[in-house]
Amino acid sequence: MESSALLTAGVLFLFVAVVAVPIAARLGIGAVLGYLIAGIAIGPWGLGFIRDVDAILHFSELGVVFLMFIIGLELNPSKLWTLRRSIFGVGAAQVGLSTLLLGGALYLTDFSWQSALIGGVGLAMSSTAMALQLMREKGMNRSESGQLGFSVLLFQDLAVIPALALIPILAGVQGDFGDWERIGLKVAAFLGMLIGGRYLVRPLFRFIAASGVREVFTAAALLLVLGSALFMETLGLSMALGTFIAGILLAESEYRHELEIAIEPFKGLLLGLFFISVGMALNLGILYTHIVKIMVAVLVLVAVKAAVLYFLARVNRMRRSERLQFAGVLSQGGEFAFVLFSAAASFNVLKGEQLPLLLVTVTLSMMTTPLLMQLIDRILARRYNVQDVPDEKPYVEDDEPQVIVVGFGRFGQVISRLLMANKMRITVLERDISAVSLMRSYGYKVYYGDATELELLRSAGADKARSIVITCNAPEDTMEIVHLCQQHFPNLEILARARGRVEAHELLQTGVRHFSRETFSSALELGRKTLVTLGMHPHQAMRAQQHFRRLDMRMLRELMPQLTGDVAQISRVKEARRELEDIFQREMQRERRRPSVWDEDDE
């Protein structure tokens, strides 16, 4: 691809991402499906803006590579060891059963046993990129279904290696001593990567970090990820597996969080490019010619994989509320199927139209998953939210709550318990289905759903409630809910959780008067107790705490308009800090002159 064509393609990709994703979000179909549809639109079977799909698809696989590196960073070896049973138990069972059933279905058509076997293995693989993206969107990462889903995906990545080695054997290509020698060299090189990564990479990053130049650290992070991917591809192994191992080797290092920050922007963009490329690769000509056969194949693929996954979830004693999510999020074909099927076609294991038919089936199955997860969300919402409620109230029973609490983590639980202890009618909205089912078993009135959806807020009674308390973990979700409430429920009093000063500034700018900085309040309380242990009277310590809170809030409001100015902001912060100290000292001196009858028993 020429430089001008490459630049044009880059601009086009960014344009469709900027346009397609917000539209998809507005339609409620999810970002992944938006990317896929955008890819179809600009690909060779759509408007034809992009022709060289294979080159772009290969490049866009780097999105999966970056994703696996970040996942590796979040898993230390000890945590990975605890997952060994689910990886090699449930993961192996999923691949084995799915291969047997799907391969058997292919064999009943015009596939030979060799092509049916490799076809079954390829169709058994799920899309790591899509599944992990959807798990994050649905809040499944820390749930039982999310942990087990990750274990299955990891085993699938490992299974690609022997599957690729199996293809020449199925093709009848005989190996010689040289083949075994090359395999031995690959194993030795792989072990060398493990040892080198364990003992050399951390000192290298320590040396780079000492320079204090952030750009060099980012370059080193990219070098590590891309170098690991290239090394594994040279060995004929999975690029994603190589970067996953590199991430695990650095999971316990002091540079873990800095590496995540450096890699995250590249991961997001390249994952979007990957999904766009998958959409572009969809052969609409084959689809039009064999539409009935392909639609049946997609239905069988999704149904068989979902049934296998649901069965394994039940055997594994997963909560009933999570089985559907687990089965749905992994029910599609995956990106490694493209690699396996292309390799099989090069060895003539797959013949004629078998390759394009399988590729179209896998691509369409990936497009069904976001829609399937939306259907599952609605099923779960009805099952766990509505109890003898008419159909026109689709999510939650509306009995005019006084307060709606969004989020039922530790922060939201404390608030909810305080409100219920004071006989307040509350409705709690939570999108982690495992938390919903667990808390409902204890008698809490918790409902499943994503509070960034306007319809859910309506059915929860936001138009009749007096207040809404937003305790989301993600600041972007908090701001989206704030905007929805201000636009559609202007009489609703908004109270919000702020993770820090940045989120507090954003809430102030939107007009939210009532918010709490989670670390600030607990730090102030501990600071008050520290003053008491240093000899200050409890009453004076409490007054000092109150003065500091009031003055800090004043400084927060004064600095709000200057949030974006670097040099001026630093100067103003220093000035405000000095002013805060002066005012604080004057007020505390006045306070000490006041008589106090409070002793330590009143603390």
UniProtKB/Swiss-Prot annotation:
The chain crosses the membrane at residues 5-25, 29-49, 55-75, 87-107, 115-135, 152-172, 180-202, 207-227, 230-250, 268-288, 291-311, 326-346, 356-376. The keyword Chloroplast does not apply. It is found in: Cell inner membrane. It is a multi-pass membrane protein. It comes from the Bacteria. InterPro entries: Cation/H_exchanger_TM, K/H_exchanger, K_H_efflux_KefB, Na+/solute_symporter_sf, NAD(P)-bd_dom_sf, RCK_N. GO terms for cellular component: plasma membrane. HAMAP family: K_H_efflux_KefB (MF_01412). This is Glutathione-regulated potassium-efflux system protein KefB. It comes from Pectobacterium carotovorum subsp. carotovorum (strain PC1).
